């Protein structure tokens, strides 16, 4: 069906990059994957939908560019039309642990991170309403808390990109209800939250279990980020009592988190067992706090980042690994549960770690263990990981559930093939982010609460362009041309808002400008 489109900008400015920039990729994806699995937008309309919706990227790294467009092509497949509006799915095929319309809340925050860069805002509006007001009497959807989430923080981050205050403030009471529900379900007497690893979407972890009630860096980071976001939204709504209440919650959680989750012996944020002792393993979830700017710039927390490039820590050819490789329980299992978090590389975790790394490089005084070069290496590994060897021997962009971090084989997929239970469950799995990492990390558009454009690239190419980016009701173009001979728009870094140049630098460096 043809879909009418709703745009933030009143009129689209002239494009620097034509749609032919990516049309051949779309045609390639159709040839590679002729299964015609999709939701509301059929493959026959994929190019038109992408042309009308996505930021257009051109850069010298053709494989990164190819994966960027593949991820948008795949994201589109997961937009499902229901009698109550649009939802996003994780799996294209039905799974038993989903709720209505095959929806699952586990990767909700990542769905919002990606979708905030679409020009049609209805998808996320409907999707958020489904989870926050789709339950009994307009309450939370009944399976929403099946998994931990950072929804309030994701809604705030969406506002940082689109600037739609009316939509944001309208969510406040639902987000408060969400937070209070988590408090009633998971808050412990010491002020932190507990969670089972499977309800973090991270089953078979070294530190957790399906029945144990451990204090995990994940849910406690999410709850801090949610409290902080609710306080900020309340301030915009003029509800000072709510603002003060949630500022106090956030302040208390941050101090407790840093005091209790930091293991000074391992120099890492770690899980606490029910008996109050550390689980005694560094896991990739220890980087989650930086994805939300939780750790303060003190106490040597930056030491944790040395593990990311250590082959005995998390570094691997198709990593990072989800647990440190030096631990005796680290394993890449060929038996048991298909989905294990005791070693395999998960795009879900990699997405959060790369967001965390970009935040450290932008918002902190970065430790020596994390540099733009290291960030680009890790992003390159993530890009390389998202591929599949097809029956004809060619290699195409692809994303599934988890990877063997040493071979790059999609592990759950391979195990199911071995067991003769494979049915394509994880094909084009919508459980991670990529476009948002390119836009906010590599290209460096850093969304802000004020009416300011800030760009701080982590790329080191001689040229790139990100075009038609919706931001605060405008369409942005971020263009870097070292010599001025590639795009013929002048030399240097230039930022345009609706075709009007608003910022310029001769070097590839931070720029900012008022809209």
Where are these regions (language model features)?
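Sec-dependent signal peptide recognition
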Residues: 1-7
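The feature captures the catalytic groove of carbohydrate-active enzymes
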Residues: 22-38, 45, 137-149, 165, ...
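Alpha-helical support elements that line or immediately flank enzyme active sites
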Residues: 95-128, 284-297, 350-363, 372-373, ...
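Active-site acid/base region of carbohydrate-active enzymes
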Residues: 59-70, 80, 101, 105-108, ...
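Short glycine/serine- and small hydrophobic-enriched flexible loop segments
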Residues: 113-116, 153-160, 225-236, 291-294, ...
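Non-catalytic carbohydrate-binding regions of carbohydrate-active enzymes
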Residues: 237-273, 302-475
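Hydrophobic h-region of N-terminal signal peptides that target proteins for export
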Residues: 7-15
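Acidic/polar, glycine-enriched structural segments that form the non-catalytic walls/loops
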Residues: 14-100, 160, 165-167, 172, ...
């Amino acid at each position: 069906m043809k879909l009418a489109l709703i745009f933030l900008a009143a009129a689209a400015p002239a494009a620097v990059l034509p749609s032919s920039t990516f049309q051949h990729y779309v045609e390639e994806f159709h040839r590679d994957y002729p299964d015609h699995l999709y939701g509301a937008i059929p493959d026959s309309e994929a190019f038109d939908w992408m042309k009308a919706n996505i930021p257009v990227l051109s850069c010298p790294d053709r494989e990164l560019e190819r994966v960027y467009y593949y991820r948008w092509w795949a994201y589109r497949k997961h937009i499902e039309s229901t009698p109550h509006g649009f939802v996003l799915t994780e799996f294209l095929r039905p799974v038993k642990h989903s709720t209505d319309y095959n929806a699952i809340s586990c990767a909700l925050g990542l769905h919002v991170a990606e979708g905030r860069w679409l020009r049609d805002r209805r998808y996320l509006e409907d999707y958020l309403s489904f989870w926050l007001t789709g339950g009994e009497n307009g309450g939370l959807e009944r399976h929403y808390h099946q998994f931990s989430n950072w929804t309030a923080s994701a809604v705030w981050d969406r506002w940082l990109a689109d600037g739609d205050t009316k939509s944001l403030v309208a969510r406040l009471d639902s987000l408060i209800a969400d937070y209070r529900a988590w408090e009633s379900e998971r808050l412990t007497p010491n002020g932190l939250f507990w969670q089972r690893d499977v309800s973090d979407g991270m089953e078979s972890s070294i530190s957790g279990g399906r029945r144990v009630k451990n204090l995990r860096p994940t849910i406690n980071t999410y709850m801090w980020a949610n409290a902080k976001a609710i306080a900020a939204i309340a301030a915009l709504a003029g509800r000072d009592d709510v603002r003060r209440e949630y500022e106090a919650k956030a302040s208390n959680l941050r101090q407790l988190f840093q005091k209790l989750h930091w293991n000074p012996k391992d120099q890492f944020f770690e899980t606490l067992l029910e008996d109050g002792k550390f689980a005694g393993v560094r896991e990739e979830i220890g980087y989650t706090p930086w994805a939300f700017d939780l750790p303060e710039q003190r106490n040597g927390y930056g030491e944790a980042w040395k593990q990311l490039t250590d082959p005995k820590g998390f570094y691997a050819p198709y990593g990072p690994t989800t647990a440190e490789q030096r631990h005796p329980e680290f394993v890449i299992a060929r038996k048991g549960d298909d989905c294990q978090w005791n070693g395999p590389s998960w795009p879900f975790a990699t997405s959060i770690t790369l967001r965390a790394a970009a935040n450290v490089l932008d918002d902190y005084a970065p430790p020596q263990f994390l540099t733009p070069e290291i960030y680009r290496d890790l992003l390159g590994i993530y890009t390389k990981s998202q591929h599949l060897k097809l029956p004809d021997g060619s290699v195409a962009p692809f994303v599934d559930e988890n990877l063997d971090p040493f071979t790059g084989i999609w592990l759950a997929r391979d195990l199911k093939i071995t067991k003769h239970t494979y049915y394509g469950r994880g094909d084009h799995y919508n459980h991670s982010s990529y476009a948002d990492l390119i836009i906010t990390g590599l290209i460096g558009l850093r969304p802000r609460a004020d009416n300011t454009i800030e760009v701080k690239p982590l790329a080191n190419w001689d040229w790139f362009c990100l075009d038609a980016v919706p931001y605060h009701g405008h369409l942005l173009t971020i263009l870097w041309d070292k010599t001025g001979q590639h795009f013929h728009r002048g030399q240097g870094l230039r930022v345009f808002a609706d075709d009007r140049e608003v910022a310029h630098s001769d070097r590839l460096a931070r720029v900012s400008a008022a809209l």
